[in-house]
Amino acid sequence: MNESIVISLGGSVISGDPIDADYLQSFAKILASSKFKRIGIVTGGGKTARSYISLLRSLGINENMLDEIGIYATRMNALSLASLLKGANPIIPSTVEEAVNLMSEYRFVVMGGTEPGHTTDTVAALLCERSDTDTLINITSVDGVYDLDPNKYKDARRFDTLGYREAITLSTGSSVGAGPNVFMDITALSIAMRSKIKVIVASRDLNNLKNILEGKPSVFTSIEEKA
């Protein structure tokens, strides 16, 4: 890892009623104590986004507008986190380019979604690529990438490492219908592959995240180029 890192913080991870404030506070403390000089964080929409989208879809709102509503939910989560981080950007950027520029000014740059059709994982991968950051930590609801949904199958096997193409194949197979086994979308993985960004897929466990940031033994799946 270099002096910068990007974290994709899944919306389901920070969901509460409507947001898990205790988790965000603890998450912020861990980041503040880390060795990294620049940290980009991209937040998902979580429960807030799902609630609005579900309600408005039932009223016949078109999918493009629903995407926009989801993006604003991610930015609200981003602003909530930024308010807890000393040295974070006070205004949430609406593009990756804006976020990259802010990374030269702030230690922590927090953002949400950018445009319809781009997941926050894709935004995080683009932020890595454009800021020359070589590692992306994807915090999800499970502790890595599995061959099967671990919440449904007791014999599901977690991978310690995967190549990019292996990960894309698994993501393609699990992307029909959202669920716990959809660890990262294909576009985000393709960006990681073309720029050789190491992706660490880990759970919301904060002690585990602290160990990852400190380079200590931890539980995750690493997605990177295989020899």
From Swiss-Prot:
Which pathway does the protein contribute to? Pyrimidine metabolism; CTP biosynthesis via de novo pathway; UDP from UMP (UMPK route): step 1/1
Q: Where in the cell is it found?
A: Cytoplasm
Keywords annotated in UniProt: ATP-binding, Cytoplasm, Kinase, Nucleotide-binding, Pyrimidine biosynthesis, Transferase
Keyword Coiled coil applies? no
In which residues is ATP bound? 11-12, 46, 50, 140, 146, 149
Chief subcellular location equals cytoplasm
Family classification: Belongs to the UMP kinase family.
| UniProt-recorded name of the protein | Uridylate kinase
Name the source organism: Thermoplasma volcanium (strain ATCC 51530 / DSM 4299 / JCM 9571 / NBRC 15438 / GSS1)
